[in-house]
């Protein structure tokens, strides 16, 4: 079988990922829920995973990594927890429904929304961004790469505009994480949402939010955290502020192993191989009658997601 649905999930995981999940199921307890060995082992592993994610995306702030079950939960947490009635948000027409539907829901609650269009090749109309900014604009949220066309968005350009206007910059890295190197620092990203089971090569049921310090987000859910249990509300400190209930420790163990595998292999090597396979597929598929491609065709030397 030739598998062609990696934008939905990667089918083959590295052996070390499968082994890490199995070992966690056999040996790890519940993180933060006790002082016995298996619980402590789980806590240490999850902290190592926070460190790995933080370094991988150049956040370098482990406490700013909050784990979720996927990118959709991460994006809902951010969108529903960051904006209030009267705020204005800018996004693009390229977004996945995990961005658009929560934004439409917030629009019904009084949040203003502007959507930047795209040209004939499905590239963002960047020149429209600054003219969309208002006095009440709070943030720009956009995908790093389209799951439909594979086009990459120039997040460095958007990040610079956001910083110049003191706006929060939120990036959905669902498709690009693990396929394209991402630096939150270089691209001036304030919040990055990711899923673990696509380009990061981790298990399904994993994802998270990377948040720069001093950004306040209302929690999407409340419950047990294993710390400060006497409080009536969620602890204010990250990551516990955004994590309620038992984490997917087994999945996070697999994600930690997957990031280790990517670091050893390097994202750059993965990117070059995927782009080579993409061009090979494109050059042959375009010869098939009645096939139509959306977005820019993949060109050698031009970064493109492994998506057509």
Q: For each of these PLM feature ranges, what is it?
A:
Residues 1-308:
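Pyridoxal 5′-phosphate
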């Amino acid at each position: 079988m030739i598998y062609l649905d990696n934008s939905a999930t990667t089918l083959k995981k590295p052996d070390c990922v499968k082994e890490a999940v199995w070992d966690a199921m056999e040996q790890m307890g519940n993180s933060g829920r006790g002082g016995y060995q298996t619980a402590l082992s789980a806590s240490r592993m999850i902290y190592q995973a926070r460190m790995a994610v933080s370094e991988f995306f150049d956040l370098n702030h482990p406490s700013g990594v909050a784990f979720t079950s996927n990118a959709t939960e991460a994006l809902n947490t951010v969108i529903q927890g960051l904006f209030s009635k009267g705020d204005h948000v800018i996004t693009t027409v390229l977004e996945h429904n995990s961005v658009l539907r929560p934004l439409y829901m917030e629009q019904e609650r009084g949040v203003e929304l502007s959507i930047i269009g795209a040209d004939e090749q499905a590239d963002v109309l960047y020149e429209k961004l600054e003219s969309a900014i208002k006095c009440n604009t709070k943030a720009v949220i956009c995908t790093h790469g389209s799951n439909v066309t594979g086009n990459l968005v120039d997040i460095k350009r958007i990040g610079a505009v956001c910083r110049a206007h003191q706006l929060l910059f939120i990036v959905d890295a669902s498709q690009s994480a693990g396929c394209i190197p991402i630096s939150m620092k270089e691209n001036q990203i304030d919040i990055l949402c990711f899923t673990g089971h696509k380009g990061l090569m981790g298990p399904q049921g994993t994802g998270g939010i990377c948040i720069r310090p001093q950004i306040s987000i209302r929690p999407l859910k409340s419950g047990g955290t294993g710390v400060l249990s006497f409080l009536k509300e969620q602890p204010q400190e990250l990551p516990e502020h955004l994590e309620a209930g038992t984490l997917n420790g087994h999945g996070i163990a697999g994600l930690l192993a997957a990031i280790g595998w990517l670091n050893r292999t390097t994202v750059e090597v993965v990117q070059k191989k995927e782009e080579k396979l993409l061009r090979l597929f494109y050059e042959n598929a375009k010869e098939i009658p009645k096939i139509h491609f959306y977005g820019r065709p993949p060109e050698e030397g031009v970064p493109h997601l492994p998506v057509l």
